[in-house]
A protein has these predicted regions:
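Double-stranded beta-helix
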Residues: 5, 86-112
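Well-ordered beta-strand positions in beta-sheet-rich domains
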Residues: 46, 68-70, 84, 93
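A short, N-terminal "cap"/entry segment at the start of jelly-roll beta-barrel domains
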Residues: 1-25, 34-36, 69, 112
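Short beta-strand His + acidic residue motifs that chelate non-heme Fe in jelly-roll/DSBH
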Residues: 35-38, 56-58, 77-79, 84-90, ...
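Residue-level "contact hotspot" at macromolecular interaction interfaces
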Residues: 27-28, 48, 70, 78
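Short acidic-glycine-tyrosine-enriched beta hairpin
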Residues: 60-82
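Short, well-structured hydrophobic secondary-structure segments
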Residues: 25-47
């Protein structure tokens, strides 16, 4: 299907893609799988954990420090544009809804 994109960490299911809005479900079938550290130049995101749990790590660009937080089921987390972020599943079959202000490809991987 055109609305499902497979990744090393799992898959994303796009349920809405408008000019200024995008809605996705991110599915991590295996614990310990993670997205690479990355940022978006203009995209802002909000996440809601539907199932399982995640560890989110982000860099506060104001102080240059990395922070981590566990996100259990029911958690909400917002990511401003230009914020380096990494997401790792802590349980098998973890999933979250993602809403963002854009559906354009605005993904910049950090590191190797």
């Amino acid at each position: 299907m055109d609305n499902i994109k497979e990744h090393e960490w799992g898959r994303e299911i796009v349920w809405s893609a408008k000019e200024n809005y995008c809605g996705k479900i991110l599915v991590f079938e295996k614990a310990e799988k993670s997205m690479p550290l990355h940022f978006h130049k203009s995209k802002e995101k909000s996440w809601f954990v539907n199932a399982g749990a995640f560890l989110i790590t982000w860099v506060d660009t104001a102080d240059g420090k990395a922070y981590s937080k566990e996100l259990p089921e029911g958690s909400v987390f917002e990511i401003p544009a230009l914020t380096p972020v990494k997401l790792q599943a802590l349980q098998d079959n973890s999933a979250m809804a993602e809403c963002s202000n854009s559906s354009e490809d605005d993904f910049y991987k950090i590191g190797l």
